[in-house]
Amino acid sequence: MLASTFSYRMYKTALILAALLGSGQAQQVGTSQAEVHPSMTWQSCTAGGSCTTNNGKVVIDANWRWVHKVGDYTNCYTGNTWDKTLCPDDATCASNCALEGANYQSTYGATTSGDSLRLNFVTTSQQKNIGSRLYMMKDDTTYEMFKLLNQEFTFDVDVSNLPCGLNGALYFVAMDADGGMSKYPTNKAGAKYGTGYCDSQCPRDLKFINGQANVEGWQPSSNDANAGTGNHGSCCAEMDIWEANSISTAFTPHPCDTPGQVMCTGDACGGTYSSDRYGGTCDPDGCDFNSFRQGNKTFYGPGMTVDTKSKFTVVTQFITDDGTASGTLKEIKRFYVQNGKVIPNSESTWSGVGGNSITNDYCTAQKSLFKDQNVFAKHGGMEGMGAALAQGMVLVMSLWDDHAANMLWLDSNYPTTASSSTPGVARGTCDISSGVPADVEANHPDASVVYSNIKVGPIGSTFNSGGSNPGGGTTTTAKPTTTTTTAGSPGGTGVAQHYGQCGGNGWQGPTTCASPYTCQKLNDFYSQCL
């Protein structure tokens, strides 16, 4: 993931001087603005379909926060440059500077209501803020850690107000639960202030990494007034559940050699921020499934099968080889629910790249056809992604524009110099001139995305064919009906092995189970050999 950053300049009105926490060589915390995390509920479900509400909270990433001198209001960071006196090096900067609390609605345009989070694109208060990145919290000092092997993750989303060039992204990264405080004692802010971010791009635009500033080698961006890159990056595995606007969407696993957060240096980081994209320890490209890119150009968009003019439900299943949470990740499946209808993910129409889910075989075939480097396999493939899912990952909800590639990799032709008829080039209907951040920010400042009704549970537990309430209610959850069918039911050819799928709406694979197993219907969209 890429993201815009935000520098909070001096408050225009005088503030009463408050005592600021700070001592030693450490990344500090300010007290001018109290940090109050907005509440957001989500649900955990059981195999029987019963769901329990959890009282979560969200926190905005540290990169968006005002960074000022300990003891007064002098900026440590203004625009896209560091104060050279306060920040001559990484350690001194961390000692001199404090992260401030956030006013979520007025400064960042982020609001919650019950189980929903709305992110506005451009918010103007004393300064103009562009986009945001927030994390789900377990409590005020700890991120919620989701372990998704042999589970499904479900949420509702409204992308109707996201035009070309924007990305409303919901995804998981293998951050530390405390934001790195226990590993790096100089980090005094921790998860409470949104520290510890990492992803598969090994981002070098972060102002603080591992309890120290990232000022050494900092180069201000040439096209982003708020951002730059430092010598260090922050790497970890990333599972992109949802990257989307109203035109295109993709889901993409990105494994790393080491699943958890590690700091990298210079171009050895790889990814978007380095001259050698594939020189790091993570897969910056991932293995994506974009329905348009896979050949179905009428599946997702305004008025299409999944109609982005209204809210819908997104279901992602993480299926293991043995049907347990300790198994090896073998498949990532996708369903949608809209207006009471379960919609299986579209099938890839390219010859030699079949299916509607992500597997190692799919990724190998897709990379070969599209002539992309198979960096996914190099860094562990599905097994590597599964290792991160097993240890637990943090939920990220964001909205951003793209100063590196104008989001054309998601919603247009990319690379722009290639023919749209070349396999893998066409990703959406947006023009290749679209997505320039300055244009998007000027023409669509009122863009927004809403995430809601998050549920996590065993396969088949978080939704049913009752689907979303188009009138704005939440997705209903009913107890799946379990029935047994005999082997040899009509359908696809071949035999499904133990724990394999053997039926469900849109299923075209085998419906016969290897002996002694039988095909058991968990719900309308999924039957399994048990």
Swiss-Prot record:
Write out the catalysed reaction: Hydrolysis of (1->4)-beta-D-glucosidic linkages in cellulose and cellotetraose, releasing cellobiose from the non-reducing ends of the chains
Q: Which GO terms describe its molecular function?
A: cellulose 1,4-beta-cellobiosidase activity; cellulose binding
Q: Which GO CC annotations does the UniProt entry carry?
A: extracellular region
State the residue spans of region: Catalytic.
Answer: 27-461
Gene3D superfamilies xref list:
Glycoside hydrolase, family 7, domain
Q: Where is this region: Disordered?
A: 462-492
Would you kindly state one Gene Ontology biological process term found in this protein's UniProt entry?
A: cellulose catabolic process
Subcellular location per the Swiss-Prot or TrEMBL entry: Secreted
Locations of Low complexity compositional bias?
475-488
What residues are glycosylation sites in this protein? N296
Residues of the CBM1 domain: 494-530
Keyword line? Carbohydrate metabolism, Cellulose degradation, Disulfide bond, Glycoprotein, Glycosidase, Hydrolase, Polysaccharide degradation, Secreted, Signal
EC nos? 3.2.1.91
Segment Ser/Thr-rich linker: which positions? 462-494
* Record has Disulfide bond as a keyword: yes
User: What is the disulfide pattern of this chain?
Assistant: C502-C519, C513-C529
Kindly indicate whether the keyword Glycoprotein belongs to this entry.
yes
Query: Which Pfam families does the record match to this protein?
Result: CBM_1 (PF00734), Glyco_hydro_7 (PF00840)
Q: Where is the secretion signal located?
A: 1-26
Enumerate the active-site residues: E238 (nucleophile), E243 (proton donor)
Q: What function does this protein fulfil?
A: The biological conversion of cellulose to glucose generally requires three types of hydrolytic enzymes: (1) Endoglucanases which cut internal beta-1,4-glucosidic bonds; (2) Exocellobiohydrolases that cut the disaccharide cellobiose from the non-reducing end of the cellulose polymer chain; (3) Beta-1,4-glucosidases which hydrolyze the cellobiose and other short cello-oligosaccharides to glucose.
**What family is this protein classified in?**
Belongs to the glycosyl hydrolase 7 (cellulase C) family.
Q: What is this protein called?
A: Probable 1,4-beta-D-glucan cellobiohydrolase B
Specify the species. Answer: Neosartorya fischeri (strain ATCC 1020 / DSM 3700 / CBS 544.65 / FGSC A1164 / JCM 1740 / NRRL 181 / WB 181) (Aspergillus fischerianus)
Recite the lineage of the species: Eukaryota, Fungi, Dikarya, Ascomycota, Pezizomycotina
Name of the gene encoding the protein in the UniProt record: cbhB
